Amino acid sequence: GEKVIALDARKYFGYEAEHIPSAINIPHREMTIESTKHLDATVLYVTYCDGIGCNASTKGALNMTRLGFKVKELIGGIEWWKFDGYATEGINGKQTGLKFECAC
């Protein structure tokens, strides 16, 4: 299977507070050739941010694509990650998500 890495496109304080397990953090405004030179270009990066109302993941996906990386965007961000019942890490990390059930 293809290797996938979650990429938190928010500022560091958001990542530090709570993030997807094993995610890396590069704020979208700081994505440059220099700040991404250590990344593996063969990996698929999935950008995310806070969720609805935040566009850091969209901007991050655009920046990473322009830098030559394979990218997808996690629609709904970390909030929908938690709504789907997944755990988070960080200062406010939770072992399980909210298990919110929607009709979609």
Model-based region annotation:
Residues 4, 16-44, 51-104:
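Rhodanese-like catalytic fold shared by cysteine-dependent sulfurtransferases
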Residues 6-8:
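Structural scaffold elements adjacent to functional motifs in cytosolic proteins
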Residues 1:
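Periplasmic peptidoglycan-binding/tethering modules of Gram-negative envelope proteins
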